[in-house]
Every structure is written in C-alpha cells, then in structure tokens.
C-alpha cells in the first residue's frame, strides 16, 4: 500500500507572532486619551468583579476571529474592549493580540471611536467567498454580531458627539435606548455608558465615560486624587475652624475668669467677702 504524503499547513501563529497592526493610522488625537479614560475609571469596578485579576482590556488590539493569509485579514481591532475571565498575561507575556478560537471567550463589550459618520463601524456586509476563491471583506458590525457575538457594541461618533449602543439578543444586535440620564446601562458590569463634556489632557470636548447604576460618574485616578486633596483640604479647614472655636472658647473663659477676679478684688476693697457676700 502506497502512503501519500500530505503537507499540512503551518500552525497558526501565537499572539506574540501575529501582526500588532493592520497598517492603518490612529484616526484622531482623541483616540488614545479616550481609551485611557475608559480603562482608568472602570478599573475599581473590574477589580471588584474579578478579585483574582482574570480579565483583559484591549485598546486598538487585534481580535483574530478566522485563519487567513495574511493573518491580519482575519482580524478586527476595536478601539477598546473588555474580556472577562481570561488572564491578563499569556505565559507571563503581555498580550499583543487576542485569538478568539484559542481563548473561547468573547469580549463583553467593544467600543469604536468613529472619526467620520460611523458608516465603517455600522458596516454589516457579510463574509462572501466567490467561485474564484476571492473573498469579500466583511464589515465590523457583521463580524461583531454574527461571528464574535459581543454582547454590547458601542459606536461613538467623535465629531458629532453621538453615541449608539447595541445589545446582542436572539443572534442579532438590538439598538438600545438611553435611560432618563441619557446613559446606556451595561447590566453585567453594573455601570452605565454615556457622554461627558469636560477637559482631559488639554482637550475640552465630549468624552465617553462610565457612571455607576445610581448615576455617579466613575472617576479616573487624577480625578480621584484631586477629590482626595479636596477632602483633605476640607478636613484641614474643618480642623482649623474647630481649633479656632476652641481657642475663642478658651479666651472667653480666661476673660470671664479675669473679670470675676477683678470684681472680687473690688469687693474686697469695699470690705465685702466675694464668696459669702458678707461685710468683713
């Protein structure tokens, strides 16, 4: 019996060998500061949800969802995403990409910061393979909805200060409506997502921010430190006011004591015992 030699394709690269970029530029100066705000402010929430530290946050990192050649054609890179219940490091190394079929855990939420009108982020073009072997590049929306199945997908139009959030339900994305605060509840995290106008890293504009379920803004480290400084200053002022009140009370007591002593001295000069009131 003749054995036929079959050449197997090479193994798919691991996360340290896969391309870290598809060659496109970061689309605007807001993108990286925006990612920092989201990661910094959600940190305390994720630490409570994952006391073991098993979660990962990707910022403009590739999610490889199919094997292709070149590999980056089978990847999408959300501007920000969070994956629960996976280690932040792989074999002690910093993650450089996320290979979906090896992790077996989809991101809980993915966010895109659209510089334009968001058409690219809403592209639902399906993957198609032609008879000639050519493929049609699928749209992000289709990949997130039909393949990766990310439960929450947010599109923030930076230029228009507009936010849309979709929830994966019954195999399709349903567009959510904001609550009375104009926020979108992300129920598994116990937080809300919305737009906040303010200044960060010398840029005053609308930023994508988190709030807790009661509508309190989740602060970044710089804001938390500033709040602590304000609290410390208020405590210092309160202590100083208390010290001044105590000093004033002490002065009043001394003045009353001195007044009583002077009165007693005058009474004695008149021949009256100040203690009994009798004439000596």
Positions of PLM-derived features:
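Proline-centered loop/turn at the N-terminus of a beta-strand
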Residues: 56, 151-152
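Protease-associated
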Residues: 84-86
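Acidic-basic catalytic patches of nuclease active cores, encompassing PD-(D/E)XK
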Residues: 29-81
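C-terminal interaction segment
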Residues: 2-27, 31-32, 44, 70-72, ...
């Amino acid at each position: 019996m003749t054995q036929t030699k079959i050449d197997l394709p090479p193994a798919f690269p691991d996360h340290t060998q896969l391309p870290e970029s598809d060659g496109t530029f970061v689309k605007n100066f807001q993108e990286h500061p925006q990612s920092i705000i989201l990661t910094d402010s959600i940190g305390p929430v994720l630490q409570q949800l994952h006391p073991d530290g098993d979660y990962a946050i990707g910022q403009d990192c590739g999610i490889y969802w199919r094997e292709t050649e070149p590999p980056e054609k089978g990847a999408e890179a959300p501007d920000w995403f969070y994956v629960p219940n996976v280690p932040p490091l792989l074999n002690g190394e910093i993650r450089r990409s996320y290979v979906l079929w090896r992790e077996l855990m989809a991101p809980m939420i993915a966010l895109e910061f659209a510089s334009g009108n968001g058409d690219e982020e809403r592209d639902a073009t399906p993957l198609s393979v032609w008879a000639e072997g050519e493929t049609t590049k699928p749209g992000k929306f289709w990949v997130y909805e039909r393949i990766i199945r990310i439960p929450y997908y947010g599109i923030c139009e930076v230029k228009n200060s507009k936010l849309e959030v979709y929830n994966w339900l019954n195999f399709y994305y349903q567009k959510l409506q904001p609550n009375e605060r104009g926020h979108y509840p992300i129920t598994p995290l116990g937080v809300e997502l919305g737009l906040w106008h303010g200044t960060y890293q010398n840029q005053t504009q609308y930023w994508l921010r988190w709030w807790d379920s009661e509508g309190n803004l989740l602060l970044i480290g710089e804001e938390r430190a500033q709040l602590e400084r304000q609290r410390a200053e208020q405590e210092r002022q309160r202590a100083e006011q208390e010290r001044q009140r105590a000093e004033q009370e002490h002065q009043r007591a001394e003045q009353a004591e001195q007044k009583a002593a002077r009165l007693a001295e005058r009474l004695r000069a008149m021949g009256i015992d100040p203690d009994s009131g009798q004439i000596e």
